[in-house]
A protein has these predicted regions:
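Binuclear metal-dependent hydrolase catalytic cores
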Residues: 1-92, 98, 105, 158-163
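Cap/insert and terminal regions of metallo-dependent hydrolase folds
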Residues: 98-163
């Protein structure tokens, strides 16, 4: 994204990249792997990295507030679920995560809650399956829920899922 903005799109507008702690270092490492020598390149636009604080509203630019919550996935990935508020609307996303006690706060009153449901029946570490989603459906409290991150097993039975 940053490399394309610099080289392909010739971006001039400022860019903000917000994420868990170490986002800037991880982005720079990834860019260097994708394009060796990119560490010496200077974008022709303002590039700002923001390390978001967990369970606190983070102002991103003028119009966006993002509140990240701890997710349950491999610790090395700094897993987070996010709640995004802009223009009077709320969109939230579980990210890659098994059920956590924070999910109702992430989803509560959201206009759209994007919820992972990796398997239809099989329990798997670090992910929710469809029984998990159904068990907690009422706790989510979102106006609309869309399921995502389907495994081949889930895709094979997607017609059984009314959502």
């Amino acid at each position: 994204m940053v490399l394309d903005s610099m080289l392909g799109a010739k971006r001039t507008k400022p860019m903000i990249i917000a994420g868990p702690p170490d986002t800037e270092a991880r982005m720079r490492e990834m860019m260097e792997v994708m394009l060796p020598g990119s560490h010496v390149m200077v974008p022709k636009f303002d590039l700002t990295y923001i390390d978001m604080k967990l369970m606190k509203p983070n102002q991103i630019g003028e119009k966006l507030i993002v509140t990240p919550y701890p997710a349950y996935h491999t610790a090395q990935t700094n897993p987070t679920s996010v709640r995004c508020e802009a223009g009077g609307k709320i969109v939230s996303y579980t990210g890659d995560s098994a059920w956590t006690k924070h999910m109702p706060k992430v989803a509560g009153d959201a206009d759209l809650f994007i919820c992972e449901s990796y398997f239809y029946e099989k329990p798997i570490r670090f992910h929710m399956n469809y029984p998990d989603v159904r068990e907690h459906w009422e706790e989510f409290g979102a106006k609309r829920i869309i399921l995502t991150h389907f495994s081949p097993e889930m895709l094979a039975v997607v017609d059984k899922v009314p959502e």
